[in-house]
Amino acid sequence: MLKSADPTLERQAGALLLVPLLCLVIPAFAQSLYKYRGADGDWVYSDRAPPDDEAVEVRDLPGGPASPRVTVAHRFADGRLQLAATNDYHAPVELILGIEDLQNAERPDPLQSLRWVLAAKSETELMSLGATASAGTPKIVYRYTWLAGDPATEHAPDRPYRAPFAVARAFPVSQAFPNTVTHTGADSRHAVDIVMPVGTGVYAARGGTVFEVTGTNFRGGLHPERDAAAANLVRILHEDGTYGEYAHLNWNSIRVKPGDIVRRGEYIADSGNTGFSSGPHLHFAVIRNIGMRVESVPVVFEGANGSEIVPATGTQLTAY
């Protein structure tokens, strides 16, 4: 699921100082790539050092630009303590604010829900609290969490999903509801795993707006704690508020970026074997926010002559 920020901020609200900021996009070096000759003489590329002291070339791989953020900030101006949220994502997010300490300022209305849905690419005023008559400067301590998506979302596609690969190609489904092995959580219960060779073209199953991309990981494996976060993926927001997730994509193969509007059937990336994965495949799921929790929803694919195909473990899926 999309990561959630949970910072605790404690600042003394006083005079507002405006400072011009210089912004630089500096790539972070996330992984090391080892290049060496294997036992058979072929070149080996790995995130793990060779087992002996043989000659090896090591390269630091750039981690790519920073991911969008959701932040809450406050200021004291015109006798009021003001809190505002910024959503940098090209998708709505749900945000919950918790006030842990508040001094020398009015308290929010106890009936006010400190829960908001922030529109995509937006700045939202959360609250404005008047200073009390005491001489002290207002002080606030707060915590916030957020999750992608609008909890009012209802899954309502206008047609079956397109199989997420080239027309006339067919690949086996290795995991689909209800015959699940690793898809045990709500976020993956209705996900579909499709076995395909590394480098197979991945196409959008439904049109929408790209809002998250991770494409610089190159490793895969069966260690959940180490490998789960290393999956390359694309997330595309649909018109009904759900989003499509395409995961385990190949390194440096993603052809879209956040903010791009993609059409159904558009070539978006190549399949791979990155992240927590036992072999090359595409993990596809449609997900919605159900109130600070995510769940995958059942999908059907378009078959021949407009028919509907329910994905099933052990069957072939063909793109039309």
For the regions a language model picked out, list residue spans one by one.
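Short, cationic interaction patches enriched in Lys/Arg with P/S/T/G and frequent prolines
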Residues: L2, F29-E125, S134-K139
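Bacterial N-terminal signal peptides
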Residues: A15-V25
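Acidic, glycine-rich catalytic/binding loops that coordinate metals and/or anionic ligands
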Residues: D158-S174, Y203, R226-A229, I254-R263, ...
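Short hydrophobic beta/alpha edge segments that flank linear recognition/processing sites
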Residues: V234, R263-G275
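Short histidine-centered loop motifs in beta-beta connectors
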Residues: P197, Y203, H238-G265
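Surface-exposed, glycine-biased beta-strand/turn segments
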Residues: L114-A230
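Active-site loop architecture of trypsin-fold serine endopeptidases
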Residues: N217-R226, S271-H283
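N-terminal secretory signal peptides that target proteins for export/translocation
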Residues: M1-R11
